């Protein structure tokens, strides 16, 4: 029983570390995208936003992906793209 608990704690620690790495990667990408958008001319920025939103609209998610997850992704992309304009 102690071995099982120790193994589960070890796996949990691994997952937590992987989660931290993934969060750091996402935050780094968010910083890069925001900086790039802020340094673009307004018309270029809007064209890129329109292209990304258009591509996102055309994508048909796999049926196995819950609608809530798809909507969460779409909302986050919109937030990320609109943030530099504020």
From Swiss-Prot:
Subcellular location(s) of the protein: Cytoplasm
Protein name as it appears in the record: Anti-adapter protein IraP
Keyword Coiled coil tagged: yes
Keywords: Coiled coil, Cytoplasm, Stress response
Subunit (UniProt): Interacts with RssB.
Top-level taxonomy: Bacteria, Pseudomonadati, Pseudomonadota, Gammaproteobacteria, Enterobacterales
Listed Pfam families: Anti-adapt_IraP (PF10796)
HAMAP family associated with the record: Anti_adapt_IraP
């Amino acid at each position: 029983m102690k071995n099982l608990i120790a193994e589960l704690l070890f796996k949990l620690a691994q997952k937590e570390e992987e989660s931290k790495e993934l969060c750091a990667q996402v935050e780094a990408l968010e910083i890069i995208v925001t900086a790039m958008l802020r340094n673009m001319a307004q018309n270029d920025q809007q064209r890129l936003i329109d292209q990304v939103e258009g591509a996102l609209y055309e994508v048909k998610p796999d049926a196995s992906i819950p609608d809530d997850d798809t909507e969460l992704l779409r909302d986050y992309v919109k937030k990320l793209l609109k943030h530099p304009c504020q």
